[in-house]
Curated annotation (Swiss-Prot):
Keyword Zinc found: no
Coiled coil: none
Protein name: Putative ankyrin repeat protein R96
Biased composition annotated in UniProt, kind: Basic residues: 1-14
Organism encoding this protein: Acanthamoeba polyphaga mimivirus (APMV)
Start and end residues of each stretch annotated as Disordered: 1-37
Amino acid sequence: MSTVKKSSKKKSSKKSSSGNESSKKSSPKIVPKHTAKNLPKPIKNFEIDLDKCANCPGCLTYLSFIRQVENIIQQNSSRSTTTQLIVKLISNFVWKYRFTYEQIAVNLFKYKFKERGYLVKILVSLGFDPNNLKINGHKVLKILVYENDIPSIIALVENGANIDFGKAPSNILHICASRNYPVLLKYALSRNEIDINAVNIDGRSPLYLACLYLNKECIKILLDNGADVEVCTPDEKTCCLELIIFLGNIMHNNLEVYTEIYQRYGDKYSDNISELVGNIVDALKYIISAKNNMSRQEIYTIRNLCFNKPIVMNEKIVFDLFVFIMDKFPKIVYNKFTHLGHNAINTSIMFCNNSLIKYFVDKTDLDFQAINNNITNPIQMLVNHGYIDYVETILNRNPKIVSTKCRYNNNLLHYTLMPCYVYSNVPRIKSDKDIIELVKIFANNKKINQNHRNNSGYRPIEVAIRYCSIDVIKELLKYNTTIFAENRIKQQLFPVLNNNDIISFATQLGRFDVVTYLIQENVQFQLYQIDDIHTVPTALLIAIVYHRKNFIQFFLELPQITDCLNNDVTKEYVINFANMYSNYNVQITDTYNLNFIGNDKMSFTHRIDRMIHFYSVHYGYSKMVILSGLSTILSLLEKICLASKKCKNYRNLPNSKFLEATIFSNGPCDLTFRNEFSNLYTDINLLNYMNDSKFFDNIVEIIGDLIEYPILLDIFEYMFAVRDLPISSQPIIKFIESLGLINQSNKIIKINKIVNELLNKSEISIDLNDQDTHNYDDYVENDPEFDSDEFDTDEFSDEAIKDFFGLDNKNLLTDKTSSPIKPIKNNQKENFNKKIDKYRVENMLHKFCRGEKLPHYDIIYKCLMQTDYYQILDNKIVVHNNEIILAVIYKLKSSDSTNSQMSHKPSVKTNPSDWIKSYSTNICSPNKQDHYHMFPFVLDWILYKWSCVEFQTKDKIYPTEFNTHLYFYGELNTNGRMVKGCFEYFLNCHKSLYHRLFHEIDRVPPQIQRKIYNH
């Protein structure tokens, strides 16, 4: 007995100590987990310490209470009697041992007492509130939910406990969905007390959590009870999108996904990824079955999932998934699967997914033309990728599809010959055999015009020369007997746009095999017109410009060439042409033949300067624009080389993302030239030039001449081909490496340095935004397109205008015999001329030099370079020639609040909104060289800061753009007398001056007179 007492004291001491520690905390610590054989095993989430209460008097007392309750229930068959006895027992227990109803209830659930529901009901009748049942601040009901103790949960809920946890981070639905408690989930939903779409603290719905943890039975239960599949998380993910992304990461073997798998599922799928994939697909099918439609983001993600070749899973799995989606949403095939508008059929072809391609072709109800005209449609892509069998199947089904509209004005024969760029890890090679078979299909079709030109000026034959083997070219020429019958454009050396000199074209591209074949077939040379009498084969000039020495030697041996060069004028022209535009020194041999000697020691600077000079003279591009274009492309090539080098050594670093996102995703023009180089040469609208295929080709040709031309051509063709299509980084890296561009990096850096030095030396800072290719000669002079009903037709007398402006003709030296004006201080002619840059004048007159220089070029050039004297006063500008006054321009008072505001009615401006950037070729033409057209050109340099009457009219050639009409009021010396009127400057929408004329005041439109009078 003493031993027992001693042990009891010791135990009591421990209990007392434990009680003191507990009293310091905010809430009493519930008796934790124990292993005493005489006590039942408690629930683990009640945090019970097994060792502390093996012989705890409280636990033993409670055990005694439980046994008494069990005895009462067993000994009494009457429920009412049993209830009365238990109530009496509880009352004695509470009074004797100071237990609360809550403590009794906690222990009921802690030890899973069999009749806990019955006892809870009795406790509630005694005043117990089940909603206040907590352990360490946590509701017992929530703990029971985590334990999936359904009987205990029912005992509490059926006796008044609220099944909703209130504002807790997760409710019972979230817990059941994430822990896969389908039975409890059904019970909770049957209560209809909780919103099935309620989100937890992380913004996730029960359905989203069930999908996240792949609890398929819970997914089905939630969907059957009306769960919304479109509920989004804070980062705008639906459960469908989450499953697609997760499956895509597994499919592409994303290394980060394995960490995510372990965090979600532990070791469950560590050795069985196929089971995981199967569960994801099953869950995804449940969700898709419940959807009414799919969002654009979900469609884009499905594209990457279903069309890319899987790495770690069977292709049939994603194929079956897409077929399932198609059965649910048949029209999804025509939805945009890329931001550019490619549909599902296009995407399957781009990714060479043969299973899906066959599936689409076999579906007879699909329309292979149903796509917007801005992108290539499916039939064009099938042709371009060389799927002969599928093409024949579709053509047999719908023969009219052969005349379908094509992007960039290509026909199906163009697509047959164009290169095929693939975007998957399994490239599709379009062989010569495939191309020839397709040529046979389309070349015999009467609905396809073999001489049709696309937007780049290419016929199918030019496309073949650029991309295909000689065998394909021979096959194509068999079916086209009219290929050489077109009218040829003379005075054009660059033969790409709208020209059919295919010998020159092949020479430019370095296709010696094509040139020799064409000569054997007696194809005629195009002749470049030197003057009215003498000509020279264009191909020879092209060979000189692009340094094709083997071509030059071949041409010089041909009778057609030697006959031309027998003429001294032609021979001298060729010699001068070579010395001016190439790195060849040309000598005349003893036999009076030409000997081309390559100057390998010529510096890059000299070669670049010659090439720039050639393109400036023949195509009207300014030196500044050409240098800017060269710098932009060379800088891009530097970046490609740098990124490629890093990718080669560090495949998983973000350098491949540069190649994917920066260069190829949105195309070289839209992204590279706009974003990467947006800070370059802001005074020049370089992007407009880079979007001009002719200018871009010219720039590529210049750089190609300085480095290896085929490499450069291939890379830019690749860039332009893939700009509209999704592409992964690895094919890009492999393609760049195969080109050998990295080996040219030092040369590229050197050339770019030279170009930038030339650019820095240039003092030109003029905005060359003029993309105008029209001369505007058809514009009618004095045709402002006014509505005459809006204005009065009053004419104003000289006296009225004189009184308003306070003018006195006597003070203007209008008398013919008046004394000459003395030289004006601070206005020396020499100083002004120094400000006029001849390059700027040449740029403004570049239209006069397209092809053959126009005869009146020298006249207008001289007028702009040799200006008269002028003096700017407060209220007027006086132009003179040191002897007499030539013109006077008066200042008008502007009442406009802004000068930038576009107005379709006449208004007085402080200075013009726009000014001259170039001259149309009708200016100073032979019928416009009278005194009224040729008033002092010095005004063209100074009136851009002077007040005028201005208004805008719609451009006749570009209806969405506007022309600017400017009227400067003043006087012009005409036959020795000063005549009042307006100096008229009309600019088209590209700021090209197409009308320059002085009108006497009575011939000025009345509405303009009215504005002058009112101001």
